[in-house]
Design a protein with these regions (language model features):
Chain A
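Bacterial N-terminal signal peptides
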Residues: 9-18
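Bacterial N-terminal signal peptides that target proteins for export
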Residues: 1-9
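Flexible loop/hinge segments at secondary-structure junctions
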Residues: 23-141
Length: 141, 393
């Protein structure tokens, strides 16, 4: 009995550790411009980016957030802790008080991927089934 | 009913039509190959105020369209970790404040060393509570009028920006969330047609002329604890203002005589904001003490609670209740307080077009200070309607 309990406990610990290693955003994946050095981010680091606490990549390139309104709202909420309306208001406050730049937006997934591919420092959440041409995928841990 | 001047209406209308289908635009580095991209954004707001009794924020008993704001900004990142930004701004509140004069709202250069420390210098927006640095950005809230005892629309020229600089950053607190700070210092620049000048003129006897408003030195710190509970942040702000006051000329029987008034001000403000699902819940308390060289002082305070709920992409609504006391030793005198219950409806008609309508039931006349002499006593309450539309890009 004790050994069975121990094995189950170890199994739970392994499964929990595996879940912590990779965070799946609801229906979305994080992409970045190929010039961005990072290949992965922690969930906290991603949130810091989406809440303007981190504004620059290592090396000084400014972070440019790009969004796809309506299509990735659930994933955006996971990343930022804000729903789409709160997120938009948050960044408008920063942009019109001289403290930040409003995220860029695109009309569809292909346009968003193209925007990220052509914008230095860009990061975005795209639908999980989007073609990732010219961008790199960022793993969230 | 008071209308803005017609040339301005035509200019604003043309701008509205141009902005109506516009998105934020950017000068691409492919156009000017050595120039980093420059982002441009702007907004244009036009409002209407109508009150059942007493003129407040304009000639409102007859309905007033003299309630407008427009801003245009540009920003760029010319070097690593560096950003330059500036915004021009024009506004009008009633017939005496703002008058559509175009001014430099902010202009700064910012260098971010890391997440913990950055510096911003130039004309910077002053951080104070949830809304001080964005009080004229109609897009950034549900209501038309912010709680006026704390965010007086007539006083933005004095409270919104300082010429100086600030340090800013965020420290992680492990399981306790994080702590964000902004500490600022500089000189305020009250406008000759601003709210402070208008208020001072209204307080002077007939034989006294206001020559100038002092540009006081200010310094303070705003802290935000971003708690471990997602969406909850708690803030505290403290500030000291030195050398506020004015210069006057007094007409005496023996000729004009120069006069001067100076005082210092201590301010503190506490804030709580909770974003929970589609709710935005906020409460703040503000306290100000003005001290004269004689040692005499006046303490005033204000507080509010508000709740807003976003029903869907295009509709949000919410009430707020606020109280303001011009003199905390006179809390029972309706001449010295103003209590306001408001209900706001916000319609996001397009991503770039917002329309709001709002009703107020107000008791007291403590904030009518500069519009009517002598200030009337109110014991029954009065109503105010506020309507506003904003275009942005």
């Amino acid at each position: 009995m004790k050994s069975t309990t121990l094995k189950l406990g170890l199994l739970c610990a392994v499964l929990a550790g595996g879940a912590i290693r990779a965070l799946a955003l609801d229906g979305g994946v994080v992409i970045a411009n190929p010039g961005v050095a990072a290949d992965s981010l922690t969930a906290d680091a991603l949130k810091n980016i989406y809440t303007a606490k981190t504004k620059y990549w290592d090396g000084g390139q400014n972070i440019v957030i790009a969004v796809l309104p309506d299509k990735t709202d659930a994933a955006l909420q996971q990343a930022s802790g804000m729903d789409a309306s709160q997120f938009k208001t948050f960044w408008q406050r920063l942009a019109f008080s001289g403290r930040g730049q409003e995220p860029k937006s695109a009309d569809d997934a292909a346009a968003l991927v193209a925007l990220v591919a052509s914008t230095k420092g860009a990061i975005a959440i795209v639908p999980a089934d989007a073609a990732l041409t010219g961008v790199k995928k960022i793993d969230i841990k | 009913m008071k209308y803005p001047n017609h040339k301005l209406i035509l200019t604003l209308t043309a701008t509205i039509l141009a902005v109506g289908s516009a998105k934020a635009f950017e000068l691409s580095s492919t156009t000017y190959s050595n120039l980093p991209p420059i982002d441009f954004h702007g907004y244009l707001s036009q409002g209407f105020l109508d009150s059942s009794s007493y003129n407040y924020l304009g000639d409102t008993t007859r309905g007033s369209f003299l309630f407008s704001e427009a801003g245009f900004n540009a920003s760029m990142n010319p070097f690593p970790n560096t950003r330059i930004t500036a915004q021009a701004f024009s506004y009008d509140v009633g017939q005496d404040v703002g008058k559509y004069d175009v001014g430099l709202d902010y202009a700064s250069i910012e260098y971010t060393v890391n997440d913990y420390f950055g510096v911003r210098a130039g004309r910077v927006r002053r951080p104070e509570g949830i809304y001080n640095d964005i009080q004229d950005v109609d897009l950034a809230r549900t209501s038309v009028l912010l709680p006026q005892g704390m965010y007086d629309a007539r006083w933005r020229d004095f409270y919104e920006s300082v010429d100086g600089g600030e340090f800013f950053g965020t420290f992680p607190l492990s399981k306790a969330g994080s702590l964000s700070y902004e500490t600022f210092a500089g000189v305020a620049n009250p406008a000759p047609d601003g709210g402070l000048a208008t208020y001072l003129r209204s307080q002077l006897p007939a034989n006294v002329q206001l020559d100038a408003v002092n540009s006081p030195v200010e310094g303070g710190v705003q802290l935000w604890w971003n708690t471990p509970l997602n969406g909850l942040r708690i803030g505290g702000m403290g500030e000291y203002i030195s050398g506020a006051g004015d210069l006057t000329t007094v007409q005496t029987p023996v000729g004009p005589k120069n006069g001067a008034t100076t005082y210092s001000v201590w301010v503190y403000q506490t804030s709580v904001e909770y974003l929970w699902k589609s709710w935005t819940l906020q409460t703040e308390y503000y306290n100000k003490t003005r001290t004269y060289p004689t040692g005499a002082y006046i303490n005033s305070d204000s507080w509010y609670v508000s709740a807003a709920y976003r029903f869907n992409k295009w509709f949000e609504a919410g009430p707020y209740y606020t109280e303001y006391y011009a003199d905390t030793t006179q809390r029972g005198n309706s001449l010295d307080y103003q209590k306001d219950a408001a209900l706001s409806l916000r319609f996001d008609l397009k991503s770039w077009w917002v329309f709001k309508v709002e009703g107020h039931f107000i008791h007291g006349t403590g904030l009518l200070e500069d519009s009517i002499q002598p200030t009337p006593q109110d014991d029954r309450g009065w109503f105010m309607l506020a309507v506003k539309t904003t275009f942005s890009f």
